[in-house]
Amino acid sequence: MLALEWLKNAHGIMEKLEATQLENIKKAATVMADSIEAGRWVHTFGCGHATIPVEEMYPRIGSFVGFHPLCELPLTFFTQIIGQMGIHQFLFLERAEGYGQEIMKNYDFDSKDCMWIFSHTGINAVNIDMALEAK
């Protein structure tokens, strides 16, 4: 049954994450907790499908306080797929070197803040720019 095969694969991925990344997850959680405890922000950013976790972390009733989503509208999927602000413009923007630096100019950061960047590939220029600026 295909559903069981999917579940088996999903469990395998989770087990691999637990075996290889648990310490890194704990370190990241500590960095974020320290920022929030200091009264500062955990800034979150992603583009394309990676805006979904950013949007889900947006503070609302019953959610965790301390997360600050950085949503750059042209890099979300609130745009059209073709035509005006379509996929070609989106791909250009997420790959344009320097665009992340320009986004970061809109925000004030403190040394006690941290940033969580979501990416499916880790290679798009806008994510790399954002990470370097946050560093």
Where are these predicted regions, by residue range?
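Short, glycine-rich nucleotide/cofactor-binding loops
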Residues: M14-N24, M115-N124
